[in-house]
């Protein structure tokens, strides 16, 4: 039995008629549920980008800074045609700045048809495209879907199955299988690893991620992202138990040590 206030309480923050994220399809090809968007991103792909944050996610990461994206109707219903028109308004500036569109979440692959349509439109507008994903639902993205994705920002949260499950509530293998498939497709990838003291910072855990990633020729970068507390107020607002309230941000020395493990395994890391 899931307790109210648990990160697995699917009722928290949802509209009463919200569909389950796991099985929602509906008219996804014509509308979707968007949490928000922002312009001016310079860290989520090359150039200056527009970031679209979709609603819906099946992971329940202990350090999630956007728990308000977990459920579809926590976002705003938006017509795909309207989203494409808005993207078109930004396209000339994005092209001029060598940027493009990055779709994040939540988990974009929950809303497969909507994000497929948005990526396709971005390519027709001459924009670079990036998918920011945990890879947990990577099996849903067929090769045609990935053909419209220029770069995958793949969040590998742990190399150890038990640590991964503790951090996310889900299994590690789907993410690893998706990573292997992206490598087979020679799809450019930036691996992202969140360094959380006391959770993911064990050198053995980092080494497992590094050894898995190092042989993959498609991985352009491994990015070590320091844990932060910036999303804790959202957990509090939603009435969710936040288990990492006493977890510090990693020191520069801890980040450097993690980077050295990745570099020592042969990864390009930053």
Where are these regions (language model features)?
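Conserved AdoMet/S-adenosylmethionine-binding subsite of the radical SAM
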Residues: 88-100, 105, 109-236
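Short cysteine/histidine-rich metal-coordination sites, predominantly Zn2+-binding motifs
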Residues: 75-85
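Auxiliary Fe-S-binding modules of radical SAM enzymes
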Residues: 1-41, 197-270
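Short, conserved loop/turn and helix-capping segments at secondary-structure boundaries
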Residues: 77, 169-172, 249-252
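Structural preference for long, well-ordered alpha-helical segments within the folded cores
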Residues: 60-63, 114-117, 121, 261
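Short glycine-enriched, charge-decorated loop/helix-capping segments at active-site entrances
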Residues: 68-72, 165-171, 239-247
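N-terminal [4Fe-4S]-dependent radical SAM core
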Residues: 1-53, 59-76, 89-97
